[in-house]
Amino acid sequence: MWHRVIALMIKEFLALLKDKKGRMVFIGPPIIQLIVFGYAATFDLNQVPYAVFNEDSGAAARQFLQRVEGSPAFRLAGHLGNDGQIAPLLDTRKVLMVLHIGPRFTEDLLLRRPAPLQVIIDGRNSNTAMLLAGYMRTILTRFNQEWAEAKGYSPPPAKLNIRAWFNPNLQSRWFIVPGIVGLLTLVVTVMVTALSVAREREAGTFDQLLVTPLRPVEILLGKAFPGIAIGFLEANLIILIAVFWFHIPLRGNLVALYIGLFLFLLSVIGVGLMISSIAVTQQQGLLGGFLFLVPSIILSGFATPIANMPQTVQYLTLINPMRYFLVILRSLFLEGGSAFLLWPEYWPMAIIGVVNLALAAWLFRHRMY
C-alpha cells in the first residue's frame, strides 16, 4: 500500500514543480505578503498630521505643545489663526486632529483651576480616532503629573502605573505578524489541496488514475501528504522571516509549535480535499477555496477579538481551526507557552481534523466516478 501512496506523492510533487505558475503562486506571494503585511498592517500611529489653534501665549501651553511635537506619532501640519480654518482642514483630510488651547489655559493651571483643552478628531475612521484619543489622553496625563510636581502641588490621590506583560512596548506588529504566519499557512495549504484533484480532472488524467491499482483511500493519502509537506515548509519559512526579519520573539517550545502546526494542517487539508472532490475545474477549486478562506479568517480572531463578536457567531468560531492555531502561535511567540498549557487548543483541532478528513474521504469515494 505505502509504496503506491509514495509513488503518487512523488507524482504530485513533480506536477507542482513542473507547473511554473504554481511555483510562483505558492512560493513568491506568501513571502511578499508577509513582508508587506508585516509593515503595513499595524495599529500603531505614526506621523499623523495635526494642526494647532493656540490662543494662549503662556508657558504651560508651550510645554504641552512641545510634548505633542516630540511624539513620533504626530506630525505638525501648521498653526491656525482662527477657528474658521478648522473645518476645511478636517473636511479635506489635510489633518486628522486639531488641538485648540483657550486663552486662559496657563492662567487656569497656575490658579489650580480646571484648564479645558479641546481635541477635535476626524471620526470617519473610528479606529484611528480612538487611538488618537488614547494617545492624547496619555500625553495629557503625563503633562499634568509633571506640572504638579514642578509647581509643588499635591499629587493626585491615585496614580496609574501600567506594565504590559509579554509585549512591553505594546508593538502591534508583535501581535499581527504571528497571526499572518497562520493566515498564509492556511491560504497556501488550502489552495494546494483544493486544486489537486481538480487539476487531474481538467487535464484528463484522473480517469487514468482510477484504473490503476490504487484504492480511494490511497489516492486520498497521496493527495493529502504533498499539501501537508508544502504547508509545513511554507510555515517554517514564514516563521523564520518573522523571527529574523521582524525580530518577533519566539519564546515557546518548538515541539509545542510543531504539534499545533501538524494538527492545523490536518484540519485544513481535509477542507481542501473536500473542495477538490466537489470541484470539476481549477476555477471552481479556487472559488471554493476563497469561499472557505474569507469566513475562516474573519472568524478566527485575527483582526477582531472573538469576545467582541455576537454570541451566535462565537459558537460558529468553535469549528474554525484557525481560531485555535492563532492562540497557539501568539502564545508560543509572546508568552512562551508549553504543550501542556496549549492542550485546550490541541484537542478541538484534532477532532476537527478527524471529522474533516472523514468527510473528505466520503465525498471522494462518492464523487470519484
Walk through the language-model features, giving the residues of each.
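Extracytoplasmic/periplasmic domains immediately adjacent to an N-terminal transmembrane anchor
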Residues: 1-174, 341
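Transmembrane helix boundary and interhelical loop/hinge segments in multi-pass membrane proteins
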Residues: 16, 20, 190-214, 224, ...
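Transmembrane helix segments
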Residues: 28, 36-45, 280-322
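Short helix-capping/hinge motifs at transmembrane helix termini and TM-loop junctions
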Residues: 40-44, 194, 198-199, 212, ...
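Membrane-interfacial helix-loop-helix junctions in multi-pass membrane proteins
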Residues: 166-170, 249, 301-356, 363
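Long, hydrophobic alpha-helical segments
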Residues: 176-193
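Alpha-helical transmembrane segments and their short interhelical loops
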Residues: 216-289, 294, 340-346, 350, ...
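Short cytosolic juxtamembrane segments of multi-pass membrane proteins
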Residues: 362-369
